[in-house]
Amino acid sequence: MALTAAQKSQIAAWYKALQQQIPDFIPRAPQRQMIAEVAKTLGGDEGRHLAIEAPTGVGKTLSYLIPGIAIAREEQKTLVVSTANVALQDQIFSKDLPLLRKIIPELRFTAAFGRGRYVCPRNLAALSTDSASQGDLLAFLDDELTPNSKEEQQRCAKLKADLDSYKWDGLRDHTDQAIEDSLWSRLSTDKASCLNRNCHYYRECPFFVARREIQEAEVVVANHALVMAALESESVLPEPKHLLLVLDEGHHLPDVARDALEMSADISAPWTRLQLDLFSKLVATCREQFRPKTVPPLSTPERLNNHCEEVYELVATMNRIVGLLLPPGEESEFRFPMGELPQEVMEICERLAKLTENLRGLAELFLNDLSEKTGSHDIVRLHRVLLQMNRALGHFEAQSKLWRLASLAHASGAPVSKWVTRETREGQPHIFFHCVGIRVSDQLEKLIWRQVPHVVVTSATLRSLNSFARLQEMSGLRDKAGDRFVTLDSPFNHFEQGKLVIPRLRHEPLMEHEEAHLAEMAAYFRAEYKKGEHKGMLVLFASNRAMQTFLSFVPDLRLGLLVQGDQPRYRLVELHRKKVEQGEASVLVGLQSFAEGLDLKGELLSQVHIHKIAFPPVDSPVVVTEGEWLKSLKRYPFEVQSLPAASFNLIQQVGRLIRSHSCWGEIVIYDRRLLTKSYGKRLLDALPVFAIEQPEAPEALIKPAPAKRAAAGRKGAPARRRNTYR
């Protein structure tokens, strides 16, 4: 279906009305171009899918929402906007869509967050009531759930009052209370512990209320993992053919798909025996007390016992084999080269895939039967068995998927990375089996590209090394299939607004002298901090080890640093804003996750410090397997794997500085390999064009000296061209 004149007119009218709603709105050519490109794709005018890189400042969210809503209304489809993190998801839901509602009459939208973001009203009721007053409530719960203290009970009672009075929608991110993870893990629930329609609280449950709203919404804001799960299970979202799909932060999609397909499970023989015995007893209880309408042959005691015994014997054999492969020690790991399993292990995996799938099917059958008996049995006893069977189903689902994936030699034309680990838990050794495909393009083709007619993939960073090649290889999007790849210009003048500083340090950030390099970095940072020229600063590290070593060199500054892990990220950012707005200096210190989604403009962030070029870890089983596979194809892993990933990370880190026309400042990168290695120029060429300075290191760094304040050295003049350095 081609874009109609009415749709074009509607898009233009809404865009014009938007300019009147936003103070100091600046019309931008890249934004108009993006609106046009998105409209052509979603309207079916041009190509299959669109990958469009929209640099910071383009206004990409409104650029896809306006044409997306116009086309969705005309074609009576649902616009699904998917993001990679909760912060952006909530921004679109709480800020961008309410803004558009002012110019788009009767706009209906909702958000679909993961189950774990919502409070479970059943758990909340238990935790908000003191144990003496709970009465029969706990009888509905399989696990004892009582408040740990009077203070905790009062906090939960306040949450319950807000939920009951509709002041709170049950979403963790929408309460003004700071709820620590330990409490939230008890307030929320997961699929295995949810009674679904059989729960007394089902009708008012925030999670299910939100799911029901999806059916009436024109726009649904979700996340990548939820979208993939929904398309795979054909639930939650409308049929793919009735969707318009926008994948914001689309560079995360291959990783999210890989994470969703990664399977790990405890395969320790004692643990397996425990799970099988519990399931056998549960099946016997169902047969005796709840009389299923149909009795599966596998549920007879003798057959089920023999079936479970075969599972146990195979797992025990697997334990013996991998036990010989694992290095000695409490914590150890063994990776199967190229993901190739010994023949005996492969045969065990294939057999276990069939056996555990049979157990999964049996659990599902009993669960469905139990769900239909709520009116004819003791509700307390039934609910307990329902919960136990639901958990058994989750266990065997995971086992079945694990052994099925382990049985595959290849997925998406590449090996499946497989490894085993030994861990000690509560003093007992446990063996875990892990599988993950190193390519997921076939799965994405099957779930998304082939099912949804038109998809827009967008992000401020889709390319690495000025190329879409890595995205194409990892996602399966390709020119030959009619997919288009577009790059928009940045609306900012980076050369005038900022500069890139690469200090002349003695050491490169290599492992053999990491500590010496970090000592130099700390001294340079200290000198910059003491100058007081920048109120808002950000320091980014490639690893937690490096971050902690750096902090050990600046103990006197530690109280003034807001370090990742000290508090939740949103709280650290709030404190940072408050300090800078009060005229104080503030420094955020974090890892790569702080290089994404951090939008601090003007004085809030005017100096970014980057520890080093962040190459991916070389000891990850997935990375090592991918490297082996690339070498077998006569491809150079550094070129295909490491360098594109490093370029991508660096672009994101550098992108924290210039967020608006009023932003200014400098980016300090403590890695001279950008200037001394052949690949350095390629990494620099993929960045926005900045003036480049190479200041001398402070004197205290060049030769040992008595302890004193490090003095700032002379700075060189800015480079006038990209490849000219001072």
What is each residue range found by the language model?
Residues 185-218, 228-237, 366-506, 512, ...:
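A contiguous, basic/glycine-rich beta-loop/short-helix subdomain that forms a polymer-engagement track
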Residues 44-66:
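Walker A/P-loop
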Residues 64, 70, 90, 94-98, ...:
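Signature of the SF2 helicase/ATPase Hel1-core->accessory helical subdomain module
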Residues 446, 503-542:
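Conserved interdomain hinge at the start of the Helicase C-terminal
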Residues 542-566:
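Conserved helicase motor "Helicase C" RecA-like lobe of SF1/SF2 P-loop NTPases
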Residues 2-20, 26, 75-78, 83-218, ...:
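A substrate-engagement module of RecA-like helicase motors
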Residues 503-513, 566-675:
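Conserved RecA-like P-loop NTPase helicase motor core
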Residues 78-87, 456-460, 535-542, 669-670:
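Conserved RecA-like ASCE P-loop NTPase motor core of nucleic-acid helicases/translocases
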